[in-house]
């Protein structure tokens, strides 16, 4: 066997690097994945290192953008969840299936269409009777809540995900790591922002009784009234339901991470391992749209699975009756009272406007979050 020169050995070694760097374990050299030598491991895994403050800022901006666009649907959802507006906005969808010989699936589709039509009708009525600005009632406290809530959520999730991965799984992410990080983020966010959401709910339900006199001049007046009449603990009404509601956020993060992983795997199958800088603009936009859409789909599934807690939380945050007595005093008690007096179906009151708000809200929020992260990183 003739001896190779140093140059020949060097050339063979360089040609073998892409094969050795890939995960291929087979013997077919030509099918080995070509990985650029200057590609960092973080870029290969599509988990670039992002500073915590970037998550904080990007989450706040994303949450603000989504909240402003979808505020009218949030107003309708809150009113439909409250028993104060129960008679005024009673849906006709429940009567569609009565005495009907149509298949259940057809009835469900018709009911969904009815809810959609009624939601738009309620928005129209609010606009006619209360004015355009009323469609954005509660936006102030909503933004005051959304911006820190999303900042805290994205910051805590991103930070604890990296921390848990390094502490428990040698830096590798798994669904269990995502679960732990999402739970931590959900509980931290709920505790920090519950007073803001309570004020926002009270303001949106104001001017809802038999009298047309407003109880609160503004959010600040509402805050002072709650502290004066109910004490500081009154600001944490509905916190137990918020903790229960963190399950929705946990489920959304889990689904989003798994769908994002599938999108990345399909990208690798099609293009191979590529650094983000080497992809064309159209490829980047397409993957961004897919990831944003995944956030919306994840929110859709999570919302349907966990929606009843939203109704209970709204009832717990309502202003006490004129005699000072609270109808809804606790999580379990509220579930029992609502189901007994209004039926199981009422646990999904306001679901249609909720989905019409949260799904596009998630798409806008996560999409904006990714854009801001790329700009700041």
Curated annotation (Swiss-Prot):
The record ties this protein, via InterPro entries, to: Mit_carrier, Mitochondrial_sb/sol_carrier, Mt_carrier_dom_sf, SLC25A33/36-like
Subcellular location(s): the record lists:
Mitochondrion inner membrane
> According to its UniProt record, where is this protein mainly located?
mitochondrion
Question: How is this protein annotated for GO cellular component?
Answer: mitochondrial inner membrane; mitochondrion
Question: Is Cytoplasm one of the keywords UniProt gives this record?
Answer: no
Give the GO terms filed under biological process for this record. Answer: metal ion transport; mitochondrial genome maintenance; pyrimidine nucleotide import into mitochondrion; pyrimidine nucleotide transport; regulation of mitochondrial membrane potential; transmembrane transport
Membrane topology (UniProt): Multi-pass membrane protein
Q: What family does this belong to?
A: Belongs to the mitochondrial carrier (TC 2.A.29) family.
Name assigned to this protein: Mitochondrial pyrimidine nucleotide transporter RIM2
Q: What is the lineage of its organism?
A: Eukaryota, Fungi, Dikarya, Ascomycota, Saccharomycotina
């Amino acid at each position: 066997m003739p001896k190779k020169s140093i140059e020949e050995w060097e050339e063979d070694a360089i040609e073998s690097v892409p094969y050795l760097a890939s995960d291929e374990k087979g013997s077919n050299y030509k099918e080995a994945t070509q990985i650029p030598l200057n590609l960092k491991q973080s870029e290969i895994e599509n988990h670039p290192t992002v500073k915590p403050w970037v998550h904080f800022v990007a989450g706040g901006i994303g949450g603000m953008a989504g909240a402003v666009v979808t505020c009218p649907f949030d107003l309708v959802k809150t009113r439909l969840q409250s028993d104060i507006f129960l008679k005024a906005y009673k849906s006709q969808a429940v009567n569609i299936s009565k005495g009907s010989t149509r298949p259940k699936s057809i009835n469900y589709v018709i009911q969904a269409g009815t809810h959609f039509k009624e939601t738009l009708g309620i928005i129209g009525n609010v606009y006619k009777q209360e004015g355009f600005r009323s469609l954005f009632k509660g936006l102030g406290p909503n933004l005051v809540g959304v911006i820190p809530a999303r900042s805290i959520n994205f910051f805590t999730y991103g930070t604890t995900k990296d921390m848990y991965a390094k502490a428990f799984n040698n830096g590798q992410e798994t669904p269990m790591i995502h679960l732990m990080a999402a739970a931590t983020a959900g509980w931290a966010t709920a505790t920090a922002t519950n007073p803001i959401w309570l004020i926002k709910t009270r303001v949106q339900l104001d001017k809802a009784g038999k009298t047309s006199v407003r109880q609160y001049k503004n959010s600040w007046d509402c805050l002072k009234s709650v502290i004066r009449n109910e004490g500081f603990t009154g600001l944490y009404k509905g916190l137990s339901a918020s903790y229960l509601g963190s399950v929705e956020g946990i489920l959304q993060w889990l689904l989003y991470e798994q769908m994002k992983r599938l999108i990345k795997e399909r990208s690798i199958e099609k293009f191979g391992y590529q650094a983000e800088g080497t992809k064309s603009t159209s490829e980047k936009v397409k993957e961004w749209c897919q990831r944003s859409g995944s956030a919306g789909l994840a929110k859709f599934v999570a919302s349907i699975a966990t929606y009843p807690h939203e109704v209970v939380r709204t009832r717990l945050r309502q202003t006490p009756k004129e005699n000072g007595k609270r109808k809804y005093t606790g999580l379990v008690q509220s579930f029992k009272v609502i189901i007994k007096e209004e039926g199981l179906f009422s646990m999904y009151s306001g679901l249609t406007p909720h989905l019409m708000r949260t799904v596009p809200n998630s798409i806008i929020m996560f999409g904006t979050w990714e854009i801001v992260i790329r700009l700041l990183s």
